[in-house]
């Protein structure tokens, strides 16, 4: 899992 994914960062 990526921390950015938890933050909901735009891709």
Curated annotation (Swiss-Prot):
What this chain does, per the record?
May be involved in the regulation of photosystem II.
Q: Which UniProt keywords are given for this protein, alphabetically ordered?
A: Chloroplast, Membrane, Photosynthesis, Photosystem II, Plastid, Thylakoid
Keyword NADP assigned to the entry: answer is no
- More details: On the 2D-gel the determined pI of this protein is: 7.1, its MW is: 22.1 kDa.
Q: What is the lineage of its organism?
A: Eukaryota, Viridiplantae, Streptophyta, Embryophyta, Tracheophyta
**Which named protein is this?**
Putative oxygen-evolving enhancer protein 2
Where are the bilayer-spanning segments? none
Name its species: Pinus strobus
State its location(s).
Answer: Plastid, Chloroplast thylakoid membrane
Annotated gene: PSBP
């Amino acid at each position: 899992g990526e921390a950015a994914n938890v933050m909901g960062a735009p891709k």
